[in-house]
A protein has these predicted regions:
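Mature extracellular/passenger domains of Gram-negative fimbrial/pilin and adhesin proteins
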Residues: 2-6, 20-172
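Bacterial N-terminal signal peptides
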Residues: 9-17
Length: 172
């Protein structure tokens, strides 16, 4: 029996000589996340902003390439911006015309395209992003003053004018 006890003691003490046999590696748990700026209310909460260029645009006034309908100004308003949201960027996307400076007319009028710009004439063609627009700290709002018109590609035929442009906002 004495030999049996010695063997048991020897086995227990020698198990410390082989640390890799019974020990596990340490693990680091990394917890991540991101806090983003809260959004403003865009266009009074309406998902769609309709801009009517008019129903009396004469085809004869658009017969020459480059001729255009009158500009139609409109405002895309951001309101109720949280205090923590101080600026934003907005990206414009839609179906580009053959001339990439314009959007494709998907209405029935042939040989015309649509142009979208800021009031200071910055072209907002497909893929354009306006960066770091500063929100008014007193009113917590921003008015993005835009304008649109139809541009002739030559020999415009009567019909409807239609295009959709997506404005995607990123807040900072």
């Amino acid at each position: 029996m004495k030999n049996g006890k010695k063997i048991a003691v020897l086995l227990l003490t020698s198990s410390g000589l082989f640390p890799g046999v019974s020990q596990a590696a340490d693990t680091i748990i990394e917890i991540t996340g991101r806090v983003i700026a809260s959004p403003c209310v865009v266009n009074g909460g309406q998902e769609k902003l309709s801009v009517d260029l008019g129903s009396d645009i004469q085809a004869d006034t658009l017969s020459a390439a480059g001729a255009a309908s009158p500009w139609k100004p409109f405002t895309l308003s951001l309101t109720n911006c949280p205090k923590s949201t101080t600026s934003f960027s907005v990206a414009f996307s839609g179906t580009a015309d053959d001339n990439a400076d314009y959007y494709k007319n998907t209405g029935s009028a042939a040989n015309l395209a649509l142009e979208l710009t800021t009031q200071d004439e910055t072209n907002l063609k497909n893929g354009t992003t306006l960066q770091n627009l500063i929100i008014d700290t007193a009113s917590h709002s921003y008015d993005l003053n835009l304008r649109a018109h139809a541009v002739s590609k030559g020999d415009v035929t009567p019909g409807t004018i239609q295009a959709q442009v997506q404005a995607t906002f990123t807040y900072q």
